[in-house]
């Protein structure tokens, strides 16, 4: 645990983990064993994380993520990053133009530096977000998101009359 780091109020750290300087880890969050947390990170209320964060990563409010998170990344409330596939397979990745199937951590999430997620964003197993990218609120990301790209949901809604007569009490 680094200098000036606060670990408080029900934080759970499983097994061995490295936590950098000037971090705040509190309010019933959970850090998986073997994780490495950079400097000046905030891991807060009920956030669950396992993997590696670079410096100045903010993980808040009921989110779950396993993987590698780049510098100055902000993960929105209730963001979920899946780590298992229904077919129990491993995700194929494109690395420098080549297709690869890593033996380890293929289904982890990889979020680039200065990226963000909105409330209730879902990132499917093995998806990567580029540098300066945004996964907007309510988006289900099922493919890699390039650098300098924002993806948002375009929602259609329906309004109807509603009142106490509908309840039948």
PLM feature spans:
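Glycine-rich hexapeptide-repeat left-handed beta-helix
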Residues: 28, 43-169
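Acidic, glycine-rich loop-and-beta core segments that form the ion-binding/anion-interacting portion
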Residues: 1-54, 60
């Amino acid at each position: 645990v680094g200098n000036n780091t606060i670990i408080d109020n029900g934080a759970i750290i499983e097994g061995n983990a490295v936590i950098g300087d000037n971090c705040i880890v509190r309010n019933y969050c959970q850090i998986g064993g073997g994780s490495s947390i950079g400097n000046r990170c905030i891991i807060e209320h009920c956030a669950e994380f396992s993997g590696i964060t670079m410096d100045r990563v903010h993980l808040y409010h009921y989110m779950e993520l396993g993987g590698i998170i780049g510098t100055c990344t902000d993960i929105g409330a209730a963001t979920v990053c899946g780590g298992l596939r229904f077919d129990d397979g491993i995700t194929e990745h494109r690395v420098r133009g080549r297709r690869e199937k890593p033996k380890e951590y293929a289904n982890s999430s990889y979020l680039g530096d200065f990226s963000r997620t909105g409330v209730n964003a879902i990132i499917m197993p093995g998806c990567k977000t580029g540098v300066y990218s945004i996964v907007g609120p309510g988006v289900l990301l099922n493919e890699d998101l390039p650098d300098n790209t924002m993806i948002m949901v375009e929602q259609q809604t329906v309004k109807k009359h509603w009142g106490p007569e509908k309840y039948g009490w």
